[in-house]
Amino acid sequence: MFRTMLKSKIHRATVTQADLHYVGSVTVDADLMDAADLLEGEQVAIVDVTNGARLETYVITGERGSGVIGINGAAAHLIEPGDLVILISYGVMDELEARSVRPKVIFVDADNRIVERGQDPGHAPAGSGLAGTAASVTSAITEAAAETDDAAKLDALLQQPEH
């Protein structure tokens, strides 16, 4: 079975521009694309923290170091400059990869400069004013339990007599 898992996210970026007459997509600073492991043309979900809008589009590369997050095409009706957004990329993977994937979680400041890189989707940086500690603790406990369960299964397999 294949599962769709969080691959990366850019958390609470500020939309810097919107162009209704552009041919679709979201323009993302190349530095942010690299940090979040996004490729040009890759599908992303955009969640607008400011107004609750949610949509899917694809990424195009913006000028490196510019901090650009540009909403293009019809999405400009839903998301405006100044809105806070979360860009989310998912990956389709087999069971083994799904259980071991460590997403790239990128937090940015108001100018879309990277302030923290992580792998815990439930973590909120200190001083951000965001809730997340409980989710991080729950995630760590769940991960530890999964590792213990996996280790027990491996031990059981190793102890089976060969045929």
Swiss-Prot record:
CDD domains: Asp_decarbox. One of its GO terms (biological process) is pantothenate biosynthetic process. It holds the Pfam family Asp_decarbox. It catalyses: L-aspartate + H(+) = beta-alanine + CO2. It is found in: Cytoplasm. Its EC number is 4.1.1.11. It comes from the Bacteria. Gene3D superfamilies: 2.40.40.20. GO terms for cellular component: cytosol. Is synthesized initially as an inactive proenzyme, which is activated by self-cleavage at a specific serine bond to produce a beta-subunit with a hydroxyl group at its C-terminus and an alpha-subunit with a pyruvoyl group at its N-terminus. The modification Pyruvic acid (Ser) is found at residue 25. GO terms for molecular function: aspartate 1-decarboxylase activity. Substrate binds at residues 57, 73-75. Pathway: Cofactor biosynthesis; (R)-pantothenate biosynthesis; beta-alanine from L-aspartate: step 1/1. Catalyzes the pyruvoyl-dependent decarboxylation of aspartate to produce beta-alanine. NCBIfam families: panD (TIGR00223). This is Aspartate 1-decarboxylase. The gene is panD.
